[in-house]
Amino acid sequence: AMNAGGKKAVLWGTALDNLAWWKMVDPDGNWLEVERLNHNFGKIHEQERVEFRLKRFDPSGQKLLSESVLSMPGASCRKTGLGKDVTDKFLGGLPGVQKEGTDGIIVAARWVLHKMPPISRTVCLEFFGQVREAVPAIVEITDYFKPGGAGHAAGVQLAGLEHLDERYVKAVGYATKAKRHGRPKMVLIGDIVGHDEKAVMSAASEVVRMCNLRAAEGFIAV
């Protein structure tokens, strides 16, 4: 199960965070069922310890061969700052989610599903200044919605944040929305969600204002 999640991973995590149970067949033809115990229904690294029950069955799927519990610190599943540790391919030996190689084929899975808040606004932010001045905006935006930030206090969340660098912008032939000549150095596309329309619009406007201070122009899709 690759560490997929798309831009909504900002709010709800990736595939690894939302797996509740999966069944796979190993190279010997035996069956393996993996169940996440005491799921926190959030990001895996935010849980102090994560546990998985592993049940192995014979090829018929009827005879239980072994049962064990795999336990590891939640923080070990994701590298601080980077978001994912590309150097850790093993992930504590958790079957089916290693980042390299194949230890089996997943044939069934159960997932944690999340309900999207009813109010959503998308902001498009185009940065025309130096890249070194634009990149800190990513941290400033995410901090605004974290606990302690004004966005979080208003009950508004950042559901997604997509980063397009200069090479990507050029490769896809990005059409600049601002009334400027040339393409931006960086583009951020964010989804801001909540239950109060006024609070969501206020947060979206504040994000645009923050980015205006970094030589960016912002647009809110209504």
What are these regions (language model features)?
Residues K99, V107-V222:
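C-terminal substrate-recognition/cap domain of FAD-linked oxidoreductases
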Residues A1-V139:
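FAD-binding subdomain of flavoenzyme oxidoreductases
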